[in-house]
UniProtKB/Swiss-Prot annotation:
InterPro entries: PRC_barrel-like_sf, PRC_RimM, RimM, RimM_N, RimM_N_sf, Transl_B-barrel_sf. The keyword rRNA processing applies. PANTHER family: RIBOSOME MATURATION FACTOR RIMM (PTHR33692:SF1). Binds ribosomal protein uS19. It comes from Nitrosomonas europaea (strain ATCC 19718 / CIP 103999 / KCTC 2705 / NBRC 14298). The gene is rimM. An accessory protein needed during the final step in the assembly of 30S ribosomal subunit, possibly for assembly of the head region. Essential for efficient processing of 16S rRNA. May be needed both before and after RbfA during the maturation of 16S rRNA. It has affinity for free ribosomal 30S subunits but not for 70S ribosomes. Belongs to the RimM family. It holds the Pfam family PRC_RimM. Its main location: cytoplasm. GO terms for molecular function: ribosome binding. It is found in: Cytoplasm. Gene3D superfamilies: PRC-barrel domain (2.30.30.240), RimM (2.40.30.60). This is Ribosome maturation factor RimM. The PRC barrel domain binds ribosomal protein uS19.
């Protein structure tokens, strides 16, 4: 499963839910006819989205079988995922980009081979994506732009990203 969003809570009184998408585009989840919901990423419940619309960078969704606010409220906090087999394949060399979920948890080292930390998350700035790297032995994060000048190599097999970056830039 690949997590593509999280349910923020109910919307209105007719069973609609607010979904925070983790996709590049707000409507990215609308492409998938079947979703899987889970709190723990182990036990998945299959649901079918019936209707969608976008409101304030959130997806407002009606799921089949959920018709009132009470039932929708029970879904708050659940992760929204799809089977990896439903995602378009990407080239191994990164030409097509990367799925963010594949980058989270990867170790980050600088050009000298010094460990900086691990990827804790990513976000968009409009100009480019940014890695949020949890520094080794710390609870602090370093923000590193995900651009060619900085990201020198992404090796998904060895789970390592090499960056042209020094701490404190």
């Amino acid at each position: 499963m690949v997590v593509l969003g999280r349910i923020a809570g109910p919307h209105g009184i007719r069973g609609q839910i607010k979904v925070i998408p983790f996709t590049e585009y707000v409507d990215g989840l609308m492409e998938y006819p079947v979703w899987c919901l889970s709190r723990d990423e182990k036990n998945w419940q299959i649901v079918r989205p019936a209707t969608f619309f976008i409101h304030d960078n959130l997806l407002i969704v009606t799921l089949t079988g959920y018709s009132d606010r009470t039932s929708a409220s029970e879904l708050k906090g659940l992760l929204v995922a799809v089977p990896r087999s439903q995602l378009p394949p990407l080239s191994k060399d990164g030409e097509d980009g990367y799925y963010w979920t594949d980058l989270i948890g990867i170790s980050v080292v600088n050009m000298q081979g010094e460990p900086l930390g691990t990827v804790a998350g990513l976000f968009e700035t409009g100009a480019n994506d940014v890695l949020r790297v949890r520094l080794s032995g710390s609870s602090k994060d370093e923000l590193i732009p995900f651009v060619d000048q900085v990201i020198r190599q992404v090796d998904l097999e060895s789970r390592q990203i090499t960056v042209d970056w020094e701490l404190g830039y």
